[in-house]
């Protein structure tokens, strides 16, 4: 794997230690398993709208080349492959790749998993119709450099979906105190609140990287139904954005 100025070794080490847990819905990645239907709803709707695809078709994303950055064990890569996309899953943590490969093989899916970075792929001339950049930007050392690499990875007209965590007292209370300290959904230290990014800050970074933001939604957890939903108004903790490379 090529070195990169945006890779934070301490952040990579956190997820290396949890690699075997990726496909355990009751394990350390339980929050991502719970959030995944909400994330997939947003991703599929945005891709369908941008590329004029019919989600009721058998393989609606056939012909689209998609990169899942920070793919982990493949929680998003696999659904995208099932929808017909040609999927490349990239992760900076080496131990995640064999976990993802094995699960894809067991599921009868063809996914190209690589231990690499966004910068290395961009330097190699790789280009994609869609880049998924989900819960990654808050873990990198230099968000602008990282997002600029994401822009380079997109073909003109390509779509980037980027999700992260807002930075405010509520997100500290829920994502750090609640999720890590009280509920213990995640190991302590998984997130660094100082690296969280407000929606306006992210939009500014996306524009500076050369992309055009076109949509953003909150992802809101309901403790009564124990489920996640999209919200046009509540971006106070988790949120997701869509951006397009115009040229």
UniProtKB/Swiss-Prot annotation:
Q: Name one GO molecular function term.
A: polyprenyldihydroxybenzoate methyltransferase activity
Give EC number(s), comma-separated: 2.1.1.222, 2.1.1.64
Where is coiled-coil annotated?
none
Sequence intervals crossing the membrane? none
This protein's pathway reads: Cofactor biosynthesis; ubiquinone biosynthesis
- Asked if the keyword Transmembrane helix belongs to this entry, the reply reads no
Residue positions binding S-adenosyl-L-methionine: 39, 70, 91, 134
Q: Which reaction does it catalyse?
A: a 3-demethylubiquinol + S-adenosyl-L-methionine = a ubiquinol + S-adenosyl-L-homocysteine + H(+); a 3-(all-trans-polyprenyl)benzene-1,2-diol + S-adenosyl-L-methionine = a 2-methoxy-6-(all-trans-polyprenyl)phenol + S-adenosyl-L-homocysteine + H(+)
**Pfam families attached to this UniProt entry:** Methyltransf_23
Q: Does the keyword Amino-acid biosynthesis apply?
A: no
Q: Which GO terms describe its biological process?
A: methylation
> What general EC class does the enzyme of this chain belong to?
transferase
> Which UniProt keyword terms apply here?
Methyltransferase, S-adenosyl-L-methionine, Transferase, Ubiquinone biosynthesis
Taxonomically, the superkingdom here is Bacteria
Physiological role: O-methyltransferase that catalyzes the 2 O-methylation steps in the ubiquinone biosynthetic pathway.
Q: Which NCBIfam families match?
A: UbiG (TIGR01983)
Family statement: Belongs to the methyltransferase superfamily. UbiG/COQ3 family.
Q: What is this protein called?
A: Ubiquinone biosynthesis O-methyltransferase
- Name its species: Cereibacter sphaeroides (strain ATCC 17023 / DSM 158 / JCM 6121 / CCUG 31486 / LMG 2827 / NBRC 12203 / NCIMB 8253 / ATH 2.4.1.) (Rhodobacter sphaeroides)
Which gene produces this protein?
A: ubiG
């Amino acid at each position: 794997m090529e070195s990169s100025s945006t890779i934070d070794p301490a952040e990579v080490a956190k997820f290396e230690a949890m690699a075997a847990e990726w496909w355990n819905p009751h394990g350390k990645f339980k929050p991502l398993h719970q959030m995944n239907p909400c994330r997939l709803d947003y991703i599929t709707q945005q891709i369908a709208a941008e590329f004029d695809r019919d989600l009721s078709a058998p393989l609606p994303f056939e012909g689209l080349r998609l990169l899942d950055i920070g793919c982990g064990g493949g929680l998003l890569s696999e659904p995208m492959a099932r929808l017909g996309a040609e999927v490349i899953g990239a992760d900076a943590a080496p131990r995640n790749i064999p976990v993802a490969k094995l699960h894809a093989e067991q599921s009868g899916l063809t996914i190209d998993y690589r231990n690499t970075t966004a910068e290395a792929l961009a330097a190699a001339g790789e280009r994609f119709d869609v880049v998924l950049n989900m819960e990654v930007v808050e873990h990198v050392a230099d968000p602008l450099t990282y997002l600029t690499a994401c822009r380079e990875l997109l073909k003109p007209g390509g779509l980037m979906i980027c999700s992260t965590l807002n930075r405010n007292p509520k997100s500290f209370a829920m994502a750090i105190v609640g999720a890590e300290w009280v509920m213990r959904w995640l190991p302590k230290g998984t997130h660094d609140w100082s690296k969280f990014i407000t929606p306006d800050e992210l939009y500014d970074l996306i524009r500076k990287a050369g992309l055009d933001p076109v949509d953003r939604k909150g992802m809101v957890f309901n403790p009564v139904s124990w489920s996640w939903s999209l919200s046009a108004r509540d971006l106070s903790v988790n949120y997701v954005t869509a951006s397009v490379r115009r040229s």
